[in-house]
């Protein structure tokens, strides 16, 4: 039988981090569901609940619940800030991220933790899209996911699922990079993949959320895209600078040959020279950025999981 720890005085197997923002109507139901599942598992665990400045009485409700570790923000700071604070306060060898809005199969958390064996992160890949603003979210998420796959060179079935488990000792070196909003889940996925850590995907059912969605389709989609581009420049800048420099150098070389053949004399026009010079400049910047990126990662000493 599992043991739940609420004091944070000693380490546990699993820390479940729950960001809360105006979820009073279904808060207890979700916490009861998680508790029932974990009590039936072999894992000792803790519930780290972060109230993100709720205004509907969620914090008052949480203060009446025994057996949880509660962190509360005075003002709303965003899902990423809540997850970061909860993860930093965690003591578990494994950290689970999920939501309490009835969308994720929280009774499957023990199975999610079990799937982590031999991997550094396990992500619940949603098999359907039940979120709001589908007309905008579906194509935007497809494009951003393809961009992330280009960076990492790895197939990513679901880039921004909020249902995941990971090794805390690996994740802690990237917590400072998490943005305050929803794109924190994208960031933690790409940080693991870009640095050679193993990420496994398991299919999950995804349900319509209870209560009001906090996702703003334009603002949060823009932030997702910005975060992916930021990750590209931080971890694999040659993915951008390499192709761009090749296009410039290739175009410049073809034009140089054409100029020589067309005019029967070796004289480099200004526009041709500009193409070649710009191509070399872009390539040089890319190589320098790549060296800096690799140097910055040498201090990371957490070994990937082994089978």
Spans of model-derived segments:
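Hydrophobic helical membrane-anchoring modules
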Residues: 1-12, 183-307
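Structural signature of beta-strand start/N-cap positions in the alpha/beta core
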Residues: 15, 44-46, 69, 120
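Donor nucleotide-sugar binding loop of glycosyltransferases
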Residues: 23-27, 54, 105
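Short, well-formed alpha-helical segments that are part of the catalytic scaffolds
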Residues: 23-38
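Short beta-strand/loop segment that forms part of the nucleotide-sugar
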Residues: 35, 43-53, 71-73
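A conserved acidic beta->alpha catalytic loop
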Residues: 51-59, 102
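Acceptor/aglycone-binding surface of glycosyltransferases and processive sugar-polymer synthases
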Residues: 71-89, 94, 106-182, 186, ...
């Amino acid at each position: 039988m599992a043991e739940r720890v609420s004091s944070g005085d000693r380490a546990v197997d699993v820390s479940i981090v729950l960001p809360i923002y105006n979820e009073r109507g279904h808060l207890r139901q979700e916490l009861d569901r998680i508790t029932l599942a974990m009590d039936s598992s072999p894992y000792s665990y803790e519930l780290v609940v972060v109230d993100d400045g709720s205004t509907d009485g969620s914090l008052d409700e949480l203060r009446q619940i025994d057996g949880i570790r509660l962190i509360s923000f005075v003002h709303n700071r965003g899902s990423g800030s809540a997850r970061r604070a909860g993860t930093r306060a965690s003591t578990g060898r494994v950290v689970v991220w999920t939501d309490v809005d009835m969308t994720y199969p929280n009774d499957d958390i023990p199975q999610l933790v079990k799937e982590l064996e031999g991997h550094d992160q396990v992500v619940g890949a949603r098999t359907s899209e039940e979120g709001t603003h589908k007309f905008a979210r579906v194509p935007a998420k497809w494009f951003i996911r393809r961009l992330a796959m280009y960076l990492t060179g790895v197939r990513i079935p679901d880039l921004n699922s909020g249902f995941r488990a990971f090794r805390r000792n690996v994740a802690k070196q990237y917590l400072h990079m998490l943005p305050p909003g929803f794109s924190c889940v994208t960031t933690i996925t790409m940080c693991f993949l870009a640095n050679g850590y193993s990420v496994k995907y398991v299919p999950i059912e995804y349900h319509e959320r209870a209560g009001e969605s906090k996702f703003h389709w334009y603002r949060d989609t823009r932030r997702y895209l910005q975060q992916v581009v930021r990750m590209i420049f931080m971890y694999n800048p040659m993915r951008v600078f390499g192709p761009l420099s090749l296009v410039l150098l290739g175009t410049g070389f073809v034009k140089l040959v054409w100029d020589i053949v067309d005019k029967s004399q070796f004289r480099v026009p200004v526009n041709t020279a500009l193409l070649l010079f710009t191509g070399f400049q872009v390539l040089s910047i890319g190589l320098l950025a790549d060296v800096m990126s690799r140097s910055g990662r040498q201090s990371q000493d957490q070994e990937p999981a082994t089978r």
